[in-house]
Amino acid sequence: MAGLGCYFFVTYAFKVWAPIFMIRSFPEMETTQAVFHGVFWFYLGAFFGVTLGGRLSDALKIRRPGIRFEVEFVGLALCIPFILIMAFVHSLPLMILTILMFGFATGVYDSNIYAALFDVINPRFRAVGTGLFGCGGCIVGAFGPAVMGFLNDAFTPRLSMASLAIFAIVGSLAILCARVFTFNKDKI
């Protein structure tokens, strides 16, 4: 759940603050453009990430039982460099490309959220497990926009955007630990 909570923290904070970040990074940009560029490219990238991540993990599942956790780890870890590049880039085309790739990375992670959960939870507990897992992640994620607002007030917008990488690192490590230390004993 720590991985999902950190993922939601990062993505909720990004989606709420991306348009504001775009306006502050490119003052000549109109609000409509900032909202479009701040969110559309993210979701376009996520569409392709979900498609690729899901197909990859489904294809390799029989040979690599832990592949879904591994794909989640790679997806969330790939967010880190794109968050950092996005935070400090000064070119709109490069910003758009970075947001697209950040969305792709989150899509790779997203493609296996519940499939990975089903790999380790008894079928008779899947409904309650899914509900608790999702709610727990959302509760942690709900703090993302508020913390981002605090960081925007305390630091520069670029530094506050870069701080999201910390949560992506923590989430990635949580998923890696689950794969390495608990998956083999918990797998169904």
Pin down the residues of each PLM region.
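Multi-pass alpha-helical transporter architecture, strongest
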Residues: 82, 86-88, 163-188
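Small-residue (Gly/Pro/Ala) motifs that create kinks and tight helix-helix packing interfaces
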Residues: 19, 49, 53, 144-152
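A membrane-interface helix-boundary motif in multi-pass transporters
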Residues: 67-70, 150-167
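A late C-terminal transmembrane helix in Major Facilitator Superfamily
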Residues: 118-155
